[in-house]
């Protein structure tokens, strides 16, 4: 009688929807669901590798553009250096002449200095702010030791060009080194026959040991496997051995780029000429270093401008001709330096573009590689379904919610919750389960 009453009570509870967590599938059904889910994961792996091949093409295109741009840089560098050499020659010839118009220039210089100091310190206090007291003392000494003749022949512009040339050479060398390191790794990665294999190849990414008789992508005699596996590796290759090397090489290439992007060469105080809108910061650094930045403000002082306009041709026509020659070569050198800077910015842009593509490559392929890193066992399924449970009425679980617990290779179990409309009978049931499981796995991978 007690047993009968217990059965009646259970039936009543069942009618009221109070039985939770009823397992609905057999072991055979779990295997079939695992097969269906593994096919979805297999397709996503193919998509990831197809994406990698696309990014590979973009990287190769960027690299070809970089090489072409490097040739233009070399030509521009030669022209710029020739112009700088002409400027230095003219400067040395002009310095060899006795200073003329001294009396006129010295009088103007004495009126120029106070204005230049006031203008410079006002700028420094407003823009640069820190250490104005020390900078003021340095500026006073600098102006007292400077010659109006240096001012008259645009010595500050010449020094600025020479400093820019040094900085540009340093930045180019750093970028070249970065590209050489990253490109070597990328070339090694992309030379593998893995990237030459067509995705429609029947050996490509078929699930391991599925019940139907299809050759799987880790088939021991596959050319793909031979290209990735050392001859010293015997026995059937694993998913881990297939993909983990790619992740490691992509990571190495990224590191080669990132190390250079954050290297001292790129953080050098005066490489700001590579960035737009950084002129004020550059002037601040020049003022702090040796006060020459203040000479850039000579256009704001009338008496300083008058020094540049002094005509000494009456006293020494040859010197006047040399000064004109110097100014002409200086203008050419400044124009070529600006052109070189623009090319260098384009070169830097290609470098940053390659770095961005490597990030995409890592994002596209990282989840596959991390799965490979987890996979050490012999399980024939990419995705294995452990349980499928449907919940009825409960305050914490919505009505008729289906919970599916799966594992991607050797990962920790992942629970996927599906609403009532996505039932086990739905043809897309396992595609939805696999998609959500993969999304959750990738989310956790990024968070780690």
UniProtKB/Swiss-Prot annotation:
Assigned GO CC terms? apical dendrite; cell periphery; cell surface; chromaffin granule; cytoplasm; cytoskeleton; cytosol; extracellular space
Spell out the subcellular localization from the entry.
Answer: Secreted; Nucleus; Cytoplasm; Mitochondrion membrane
Residues that carry a glycan: 102, 144, 290, 327, 353, 373
Q: By its UniProt entry, which InterPro entries does this protein fall under?
A: Clusterin (IPR016016), Clusterin-like (IPR000753), Clusterin_C (IPR016015), Clusterin_CS (IPR033986), Clusterin_N (IPR016014)
GO annotation terms (biological process)? amyloid-beta clearance; cell morphogenesis; central nervous system myelin maintenance; chaperone-mediated protein complex assembly; chaperone-mediated protein folding; immune complex clearance; intrinsic apoptotic signaling pathway; microglial cell activation
The protein's PTM annotation reads: Proteolytically cleaved on its way through the secretory system, probably within the Golgi lumen. Proteolytic cleavage is not necessary for its chaperone activity. All non-secreted forms are not proteolytically cleaved. Chaperone activity of uncleaved forms is dependent on a non-reducing environment. Polyubiquitinated, leading to proteasomal degradation. Under cellular stress, the intracellular level of cleaved form is reduced due to proteasomal degradation.
Recall the GO molecular function terms of this protein's record.
amyloid-beta binding; low-density lipoprotein particle receptor binding; misfolded protein binding; protein carrier chaperone; protein-containing complex binding; receptor ligand activity; tau protein binding; ubiquitin protein ligase binding
Q: Which Pfam families match?
A: Clusterin
Please state the protein's primary subcellular location.
secreted
Where along the sequence do coiled-coil regions lie? Answer: none
Q: Tell me what the record says results from residue 361 to R.
A: Abolishes interaction with XRCC6
- May I ask which residue range the UniProt record assigns to the signal sequence? 1-21
Keywords from the UniProt entry = Chaperone, Cytoplasm, Cytoplasmic vesicle, Disulfide bond, Endoplasmic reticulum, Glycoprotein, Membrane, Microsome, Mitochondrion, Nucleus, Phosphoprotein, Secreted, Signal, Ubl conjugation
> How would you describe this protein's topology in the membrane?
Peripheral membrane protein
On this chain, the residues bearing Phosphoserine are 132, 395
Give the disruption phenotype, in one or two sentences.
No visible phenotype. During myocarditis, mice show an increased tendency to cardiac tissue injury. Homozygous CLU aging mice exhibit a striking glomerulopathy characterized by progressive mesangial expansion and collapse of capillary lumens.
Name the cystine pairs: 101-312, 112-304, 115-301, 120-294, 128-284
* Sequence motif Nuclear localization signal, location on chain: 77-80, 442-446
The family this protein is said to belong to: Belongs to the clusterin family.
- Sum up the protein's function in the record's words: Functions as extracellular chaperone that prevents aggregation of non native proteins. Prevents stress-induced aggregation of blood plasma proteins. Inhibits formation of amyloid fibrils by APP, APOC2, B2M, CALCA, CSN3, SNCA and aggregation-prone LYZ variants (in vitro). Does not require ATP. Maintains partially unfolded proteins in a state appropriate for subsequent refolding by other chaperones, such as HSPA8/HSC70. Does not refold proteins by itself.
Q: How does it assemble?
A: Antiparallel disulfide-linked heterodimer of an alpha chain and a beta chain. Self-associates and forms higher oligomers. Interacts with a broad range of misfolded proteins, including APP, APOC2 and LYZ. Slightly acidic pH promotes interaction with misfolded proteins. Forms high-molecular weight oligomers upon interaction with misfolded proteins. Interacts with APOA1, LRP2, CLUAP1 and PON1. Interacts with the complement membrane attack complex. Interacts (via alpha chain) with XRCC6.
Name of the protein in its database record: Clusterin
Q: Which organism is it from?
A: Mus musculus (Mouse)
């Amino acid at each position: 009688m007690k047993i009968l009453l217990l059965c009646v009570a259970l039936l009543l509870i069942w009618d009221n929807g109070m039985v939770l967590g009823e397992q609905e599938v057999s072991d055979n059904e779990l295997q079939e669901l695992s097969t269906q889910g593994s096919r979805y994961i297999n397709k996503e792996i193919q998509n990831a590798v197809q994406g990698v091949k696309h990014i590979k093409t973009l990287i190769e295109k960027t690299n070809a553009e970089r090489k072409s741009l490097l040739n233009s840089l070399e030509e521009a560098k030669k022209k710029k250096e020739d112009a700088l050499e002409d400027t230095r020659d003219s400067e040395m010839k002009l310095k060899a002449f006795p200073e003329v118009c001294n009396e006129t220039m010295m009088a103007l210089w004495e009126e120029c200095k106070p204005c230049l100091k006031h203008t410079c310190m006002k700028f420094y206090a407003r823009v640069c702010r820190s250490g104005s007291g020390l900078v003021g003392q340095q500026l006073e000494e600098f102006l007292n030791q400077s010659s109006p003749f240096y001012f008259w022949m645009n010595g500050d512009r010449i020094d600025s060009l020479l400093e820019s040339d040094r900085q540009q050479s340093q930045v180019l060398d750093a970028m070249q080194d970065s590209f050489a390191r990253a490109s070597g790794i990328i070339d090694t990665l992309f030379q593998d026959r893995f990237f030459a294999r067509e995705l429609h190849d029947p050996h490509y990414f078929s699930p391991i040991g599925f019940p139907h008789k299809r050759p799987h992508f880790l088939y021991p005699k596959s050319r793909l496997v031979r290209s990735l596996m050392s001859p010293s590796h015997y026995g059937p290759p694993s998913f881990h051995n297939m993909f983990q090397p790619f992740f490691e090489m992509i990571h190495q290439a990224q590191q080669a780029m990132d190390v250079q992007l954050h290297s001292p060469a790129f953080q050098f105080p005066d490489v700001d000429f590579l960035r737009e809108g950084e002129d004020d910061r550059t002037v601040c650094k020049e003022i702090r270093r040796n006060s020459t930045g203040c000479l850039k403000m000579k256009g704001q002082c009338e008496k300083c401008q008058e020094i540049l306009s002094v005509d000494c041709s009456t006293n020494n026509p040859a010197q006047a001709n040399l000064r004109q020659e110097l100014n002409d070569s200086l203008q050419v050198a400044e124009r070529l330096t600006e052109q070189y800077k623009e090319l260098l910015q384009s070169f830097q842009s290609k470098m940053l573009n390659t770095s961005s593509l490597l990030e995409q490559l890592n994002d596209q392929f990282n989840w596959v590689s991390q799965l490979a890193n987890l996979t050490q066992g012999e399980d024939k399924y990419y995705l294995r379904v452990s349980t499928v449970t449907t919940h009825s009425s409960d305050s914490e679980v919505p009505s008729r919610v289906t919970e599916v617990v799966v594992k991607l290779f050797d990962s920790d179990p992942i629970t996927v919750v599906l609403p009532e409309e996505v039932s086990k009978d739905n043809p897309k049931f396992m595609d939805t389960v696999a998609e959500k499981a993969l999304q959750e796995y990738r989310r956790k991978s990024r968070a780690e």
